[in-house]
A protein has these predicted regions:
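Catalytic histidine-centered segment of alpha/beta-hydrolase-like enzymes
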Residues: 232-246
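Conserved alpha/beta-hydrolase "acid-adjacent" motif
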Residues: 199-207, 216
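Active-site nucleophile elbow and catalytic-triad environment of alpha/beta-hydrolase enzymes
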Residues: 166-182
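Short beta-strand/loop motif that positions the catalytic acidic residue
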Residues: 186, 192-194
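Conserved HGGG/HGGXW glycine-rich cap/lid loop of the alpha/beta-hydrolase fold
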Residues: 9-60
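Active-site loop/oxyanion-hole signature of alpha/beta-hydrolase fold enzymes
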Residues: 37, 49-89
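Flexible "cap/lid" loop of the alpha/beta hydrolase fold
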Residues: 96-104, 110-149
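Acidic catalytic loop of the alpha/beta-hydrolase fold
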Residues: 197-201, 239-240
Length: 258
């Protein structure tokens, strides 16, 4: 097992392959195990590093809320050790952390692949917001039989902290946020990836891509007006299974090879 220290926390990370580092950040209550089907495909060309965030997976929790700005600083400290500057492929909560990382520490990030993330809370469908609001500490026992719950019980250094994980996640996802103005100045070259039945509203996807210079004009017959940033939609997928799409790895590889 591999660990890297940052801000007083020992962060677990799983590593596959060789080459330029590609860091993966998972979604809420999950772990790097969320990328189990994707990481081996990406490791054919890259050194893939899946980090377990604070209080998730094999990384122990500390007396601190799940604040994405602080978690971004954590990741900045971790990636100083594998090479300093990395590409990032990130999902859901991990996407929020990575977006803050790219805004707070732009010198650490080359390319950024954001999977199923809204840049403001209202960018999610009403049903998704209602589901976030329904995730309370009282739901911990109900969620425990889920794959993330089973993985946590078997692998977490403090499996008895499951209710704390749910409570902190519950608090974090209820906070309103709007990063629209900051995203306009996002520096890393960025690929946005969404499912065609995502928890993020289609109108918000268009808005997000537009803030990155995408979809504002025709690219021209020769593609000379094509934006540097990209948008991909995974067909037949949802927010909850998008990482299992067979199309995701080739889309990511094509973007990184540009």
């Amino acid at each position: 097992m591999s660990y890297a220290d940052s801000n007083g926390i020992a962060f677990y990370y799983d590593e596959h392959g060789e080459g330029a580092p590609l860091v993966l950040l998972h979604g809420g209550i999950g772990s790097g195990q969320m990328f189990a089907s994707l990481a081996p495909a990406l490791a054919n060309r890259r050194r893939v590093i899946a980090i377990d965030l604070q209080g998730h997976g094999r990384t122990a929790d500390v007396d601190r809320p799940f604040d994405v700005a602080a978690m971004a600083d954590d990741v900045a400290g971790v990636i100083e050790q594998p090479g300093g500057t990395v590409d990032l492929l990130v999902y859901s909560l991990g996407g929020k952390v990575a977006l803050r990382l790219a805004l707070q520490h732009p010198e650490r990030v080359n390319d950024l692949i954001l999977v199923s993330i809204a840049i403001k809370r209202s960018g999610n469908h009403a049903e998704a917001i209602a589901a976030m609001d329904a995730m309370t500490p009282a739901a911990a026992e109900f969620i425990k039989p889920s794959p993330p719950g089973q993985f946590y019980a078997a692998n977490a250094p403090q499996p008895e902290a499951w209710e704390t994980l749910i409570a902190k996640t519950s608090d974090a996802i209820k906070h309103d946020y709007d990063w629209t103005d900051e995203v306009r100045g996002l520096r890393p070259r960025t690929l946005l990836v969404f499912a065609d039945a995502d928890s993020v509203r289609p109108a918000h996807i268009v808005e997000f891509y537009g803030l990155l210079g995408g979809g504002l004009a025709d690219a021209g017959w020769d593609g000379s007006n094509q934006p540097a940033n990209r948008l991909a939609i995974m067909p037949g997928r949802t927010h909850y299974d998008i990482l299992d799409s067979a199309l995701l790895a080739p889309v990511v590889e094509a973007f990184l090879l540009r």
